Swiss-Prot record:
The gene is RCA. This is Ribulose bisphosphate carboxylase/oxygenase activase 2, chloroplastic. It comes from the Eukaryota. GO terms for molecular function: ATP binding; ATP hydrolysis activity; ribulose-1,5-bisphosphate carboxylase/oxygenase activator activity. The lineage of its organism: Eukaryota, Viridiplantae, Streptophyta, Embryophyta, Tracheophyta. InterPro entries: ATPase_AAA_core, P-loop_NTPase, RCA-like, RuBisCO_activase_AAA_helical. The keyword Transmembrane does not apply. Coiled coil: none annotated. Changing I335V: In clone PTA1.1. Belongs to the RuBisCO activase family. Activation of RuBisCO (ribulose-1,5-bisphosphate carboxylase/oxygenase; EC 4.1.1.39) involves the ATP-dependent carboxylation of the epsilon-amino group of lysine leading to a carbamate structure.
Length: 439
């Protein structure tokens, strides 16, 4: 019988004894195979009560065949792997190097996925779905925004990625709305700014606000949530529209601040303080109608990547299908409406849909009475009125569309401002109505 002896008391180097008992033969240290301990006491000892200052405790191996006992060892799973997922995908074929084994409960020897689940996940492909809640996102628009935002979070070797993406194009083409759809698609809650915040009565306030919003977005990214800074109509707040606008200190500071952030995106400081810790890089998305009004060094290629948004016929049809998606307008009717007004912006079709409700509102006003409109809308216990969805036919939509086009033409053709400057009276203000017989 092999026993291992532990000693208590550093001063006594002789074998310890209890009631004049002699210690057994010591056993060299070996791997511990057993799962139980057996205490051995000397002859004449009936209880483990200690009466002397010395004590001997021996551990004894259980009488068992070492080969048979190894297969019943509870730690065997750390070396050998018999789980279904490992065998099915032929990774190790039941034997996995202990280097890749984790502690019990977290190791690869616990089956998590079957082989068909591994295959299904491996075959899963990324789908560039360009719809969100029934709204259409132009593929080229989504591609530009997604690639730009993704590039700014990647560390590409020896590549300088522009921090700012400038989306510009004609009025009412849905630039801001398309950006918001892409943000929602990517799960981004952007930090928003508008052109009205780029001017202030105090010099330097807009530039400071840009830095504050940028650092706010950087803090969101530091916490693990993707974010970006979105500035609407940058050219309206920081651009120069000929002689109609005055170039102020704040215009200059806004352009200079954006240039500085684009050059040092991870070192954006607030005025009056300096923090050595770098902030996260935040991609900036700006929209506008004409970037030629901006400061030229700001829009150079190294700082701003420019994207001209001009929706194609397919894009216009896709967006209009989203506008009329709840009105049961057939696709053929939407295509006909888009082709009838090819030169109109996308915003035109939203205004066209709103015009259809004019008849319903007019009926409610005539039934309620003009004097009681305020009470019915604001002070009624029943709340504001609700309308049944009017039926939208192609004929009605085309009729209202032609009315909107005529109003646009009147604004461009009549130009009363020039007449007012020339004469004190109306002059030819009513000439258009007289010629058309509507005077």
């Amino acid at each position: 019988m092999a026993t291992s002896v532990s000693t208590i008391g550093a001063a006594n180097k002789a074998p310890l004894s209890l009631n004049n008992s002699v210690a057994g033969t010591s056993v060299p240290s070996t791997a511990f195979f057993g799962k139980t301990l057996k205490k051995v006491y000397g002859k004449g000892v009936s209880s483990p009560k200690v009466t002397n200052r010395s004590l001997r405790i021996a551990a004894e191996e259980k009488d068992a065949d070492p080969k048979k006992q190894t297969y019943s060892d509870r730690w065997k799973g750390l070396v050998q792997d018999f789980s279904d997922d490992q065998q099915d995908i032929a990774r190790g074929k039941g034997m996995v190097d202990s280097l890749f084994q984790a502690p019990t409960g977290t190791g690869t020897h616990h089956a998590v996925l079957q082989s068909y689940e591994y295959v299904s996940q491996g075959l899963r492909q990324y789908n560039m779905d360009n719809t969100l809640d029934g709204f259409y996102i132009a593929p080229s628009f989504m591609d530009k925004l997604v690639v730009h935002i993704t590039k700014n979070f990647l560390k590409l070797p020896n590549i300088k990625v522009p921090l700012i993406l400038g989306v510009w194009g004609g009025k009412g083409q849905g630039k801001s709305f398309q950006c918001e759809l892409v943000f929602r698609k990517m799960g981004i809650n952007p930090i928003m700014m508008s052109a009205g915040e780029l001017e202030s009565g105090n010099a330097g306030e807009p530039a400071k606000l840009i830095r504050q919003r940028y650092r706010e977005a950087a803090e969101i990214i530091r916490k693990g949530n993707i974010c970006c800074l979105f500035i609407n109509d940058l050219d309206a707040g920081a651009g120069r529209m000929g002689g109609t606008t005055q170039y102020t200190v704040n215009n200059q500071m806004v352009n200079a601040t954006l240039m500085n952030i684009a050059d040092n995106p991870t070192n954006v400081q607030l005025p009056g303080m300096y923090n050595k810790q770098e902030n996260a890089r935040v991609p900036i998305i700006v929209t506008g109608n004409d970037f030629s009004t901006l400061y030229a060094p700001l829009i150079r290629d190294g700082r701003m990547e420019k994207f001209y948004w001009a929706p194609t016929r397919e894009d216009r049809i896709g967006v209009c299908k989203g506008i009329f998606r709840t009105d049961n307008v057939p696709e053929e009717a939407v295509i006909k409406i888009v082709d009838t007004f090819p030169g109109q912006s996308i915003d035109f079709f939203g205004a066209l849909r709103a015009r259809v409700y004019d008849d319903e509102v007019r009926k409610w006003v005539s039934g309620t009475g003009i004097e009681a409109i305020g009470d019915k809308l604001l002070n009624s216990f029943d709340g504001p009125p609700t309308f049944e969805q009017p039926k939208m036919t192609v004929e009605k939509l085309l009729e209202y569309g032609n009315m909107l086009v005529q109003e646009q033409e009147n604004v461009k053709r009549v130009q009363l401002a020039e007449t007012y400057l020339k004469e004190a009276a109306l002059g030819d203000a009513n000439a258009d109505a007289i010629n058309t017989g509507n005077f």
